[in-house]
A protein has these predicted regions:
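Flexible, low-complexity linker and terminal segments
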Residues: 1-3, 12, 124-332, 337-338, ...
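Thiamine diphosphate
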Residues: 1-3, 7-127, 155, 218-219, 363-500, 510-511, ...
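Short helix-loop-beta junction
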Residues: 31-37, 236-246, 462-468
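Short acidic, glycine/serine/threonine-rich loops at helix termini
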Residues: 28-31, 54, 75-79, 101-108, ...
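Conserved thiamine diphosphate
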Residues: 98-147, 153, 188, 330, ...
Length: 569
């Protein structure tokens, strides 16, 4: 689905792509990197990505940026102003919502951003529509002088189907013309642009009444369903020809007359939508009687089973098993460089202000070495606030942890604040040489760009010094005794400090692993000390430690944990 989004951007003559990785949107930009005709990059964060896309549009080239739903929060500043300025060439934004929070810290509904920013939003329901809507998005962006958001969801993003490919349509850049009143958003110009924006949204709403992106399917009229996106697929599978459907492809601004006409033909009308009651509210405020969140939850995903149960009263029968397979919790990979560091933090009993990344798993048992995780970059700012609230004693017993990519995303300003507003905070940057959680994307510290070509690599040590931090130390988290000693030393200092925990991600292809470790059964007493690091390669059988050679990468952390010498090379 995600690759279809970018295939049609390619076919539509898109020239500039700038995104920040975030599940489930990442693969859109990875796919476009294969096309030489399109310039594609990973930006340091979503705000920069959207600004790059807007700049390319002003420069006359069709542009695109992609992100997950919480990334749109980061990009909200340029988005809301772009709603006023409009565009020159078509500008399309893909945002992937995550109902069910499969890989996210919240379940927000991006439709609210489209409403508040007064931009257009369309929502495909399958691969074919992803491709069709992507091309339409550029045309609509240029027709109505507006950024167009394509809303995806986890299930739409993670599905696939056959589609028909077309050739690329090469387009010359639109000639650049200086337009201060349109693009310089000082108050006087913004005041003049606002009526233009309102008139534009009215024109889009009028267009939505007859747009082919909104589709009506009339079957049995006892049940009518108004829906959009993946919810259409659930409804169609559950109800089939027992219901008629109005599938809204344009979800902001929404039409009203087509909704009223559809509802008038049906005895009972249901609104099926995941997350918030956006369509339902639109219907009810315009006098259309619908049934929505009385039946369907504001939380989590909908499914065909839920639709059948709520509307038809049909319950599926399931086979139950006496012995349920235990759920395997997410864990850090064998050889993960973060494991040793988090064990040290757990051992020291410090408060850990956490951040977004693979290392968030440091909060899980048995390490339990993280106290908070809010959003990208919040670890450093949060630690500063924590220490200001609790005073000098807290400074000696608290740290922030943040990944290299996350630090480049939004951690630098927090570190500037620590130096500028003076707390003796200790910040640990987990430098694993990649953006790990979203699938090994390059970032400004890795020395390579999106296409794998050599690029400038930010020197983290020099950067931290330039931001006002005098004490910057580098440790190898595989060496836990040294790492623990450095953490103690930095916590004791009467100044802010940074520790860079540097070791490449164990899953990187170029990383060479050591031979798997072995267990001397005669020395092992079954003390289970080695289990405290939470490595999935280690287990206990018949009272003795066992190492799975198919998983072990020979990192040596468990060997350092075993004081009896039972784990050896």
């Amino acid at each position: 689905q995600r690759q279809m989004c970018i295939r049609d951007r390619y076919e539509a003559g898109c020239k500039v792509v700038s995104s920040y990785p975030g599940t489930p949107s990442t693969e859109i930009t990875e796919a476009v990197a294969k096309y030489d005709e399109v310039y594609a990059e990973w930006a340091p964060n979503e705000k920069v990505a959207m600004e790059v896309a807007l700049g390319a549009s002003i420069g006359g080239a069709r542009s695109f940026c992609g992100m997950k739903h919480v990334g749109l929060n980061v990009a909200a500043d340029p988005l809301y102003t772009a709603g006023y300025t409009g565009v020159t060439a078509g500008m399309v934004i893909a945002v992937a919502d995550d109902p069910g929070m499969h890989s996210s810290q919240n379940e927000q509904d991006s439709r609210h951003h489209a409403i508040a920013s007064k931009t257009m939003m369309i929502e495909p329901s399958d691969s074919g529509e992803c491709k069709e809507f992507a091309k339409a998005a550029f045309e609509l962006s240029e027709k109505f002088d507006v950024p167009v958001i394509v809303r995806l969801s986890t299930r739409v993003s993670h599905s696939q189907s056959a589609v028909e490919l077309c050739e690329r349509e090469e387009r010359e850049n639109i000639p650049y013309e200086k337009n201060i009143q349109k693009y310089v958003m000082m108050p006087g110009n913004a005041i003049r642009r606002h009526p233009v924006v309102e008139a534009r949204m009215k024109a889009i709403a009028d267009y939505a009444e007859t747009s082919p992106l909104n589709k009506v399917e009339m079957n049995d009229t006892k049940i009518g369903v108004i829906t959009s996106g993946i919810s259409y697929q659930y409804a169609k599978e559950a109800l089939g020809d027992k219901a008629s459907y109005l599938k809204l492809g344009i979800v902001n601004p929404m039409p009203i007359q087509i909704i009223k006409d559809f509802a008038a033909k049906c005895e009972k009308v249901y609104v099926i939508e995941e997350l918030d009651d956006v369509i339902e509210t639109h219907c009810k405020k315009n006098g259309v009687n619908v049934i929505g969140k009385e039946l369907f939850s504001l939380m989590g995903e909908i499914s065909q089973t839920i639709v059948a149960e709520k509307i038809l009263g049909e319950k599926n029968e399931y086979i139950t098993f006496e012995d349920n397979v235990p759920v395997r919790p997410p864990v850090m990979c064998p050889g993960c460089p973060h494991r040793g560091l988090f064990y040290c933090l757990h051992k020291l009993g410090v408060m850990v202000s956490g951040d977004i990344g693979c290392y968030t798993l440091g909060a899980t048992a048995p390490l339990c070495a993280m106290d908070s995780t809010i959003c990208m970059g919040a670890s450093i700012s949060g630690l500063h606030g924590f220490n200001k609230a609790r005073g000098a004693e807290a400074e000696k017993k608290s740290v922030a942890v943040i990944g290299d990519s996350t630090f480049m995303h939004s951690g630098m300003t927090g570190l500037v604040n620590v130096a500028y507003n003076s707390t003796n905070s200790t910040v640990i940057i987990l430098d694993n040489s990649i953006t790990g959680m979203t699938g090994h994307q390059q970032n400004p510290t890795t020395g390579k760009n999106l296409k794998g070509d050599p690029a400038y690599a930010v020197d983290l040590e020099m950067l931290c010094h330039s931001l006002g931090i005098k004490s910057v130390r580098v440790v190898d988290p595989y060496h836990m005794a040294e790492t623990e000693a450095v953490i103690k030393e930095e916590l004791a200092k009467e100044e802010p400090s940074v520790i860079i925990s540097r070791r490449p991600c164990a899953l990187l292809k170029y990383v060479k692993h050591n031979p798997p470790l072995k267990v001397n059964k005669d020395k092992c007493v079954g003390c289970k000390q080695c289990l405290k690091i939470g490595c999935p390669a280690i287990s206990i059988h018949d009272g003795k430690c066992v190492i799975d050679h198919t998983q072990c990468v020979g990192c040596g952390i468990c060997k350092e944990m075993c004081k009896l010498g039972a784990i050896c090379d």
